[in-house]
Amino acid sequence: MIIDVGCGHNPIGDVNVDLFVEATPHRSGDQSKCDDKRLDTKRIPNFVMADACHLPFKDNVFNVVFSSHTIEHVNDPFLMLKEMARISKRRIIIKCPHRFASHRIKPLHVNRLNITWFEHAAKKIRLTVISKKVSSWRSIPHSYIPIVSFPQEITMVFVKSIQK
């Protein structure tokens, strides 16, 4: 079973969580499915209104805990990661803007994260990083400088470490 934490208008989970039902400047994504920026919770399968830092689920419930572009908005990203690990049986997947791209994407991002932050946080809560990827966008070349790539998005995949 998959849970999507911070699902917004594009839920992918069997269970989908978001804190904001009303319109919010934090929301992005495909809003063509709705008349306004409110979440249409009737169209979202198994919708639960909850804070990503305090998820109302038992431990070890979901096979995959997924979150896309939510962790940069929460006040305590470490607590969010810890909660995602708590409710996960095994795998956690997080996507977010890279710290160097974050200010260009939305000024409402309260966290500017990078892979090193995720690696340190994972170690503290006994998660193992099994995949890390930074996608980039390229600037338009100027006649005097070559094409430059800038980090844009991080995708991290973790598994719970086996307890000894």
Enumerate the predicted regions with their spans.
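S-adenosyl-L-methionine-dependent methyltransferase catalytic module, highlighting the catalytic core
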Residues: 38-43, 47, 75-164
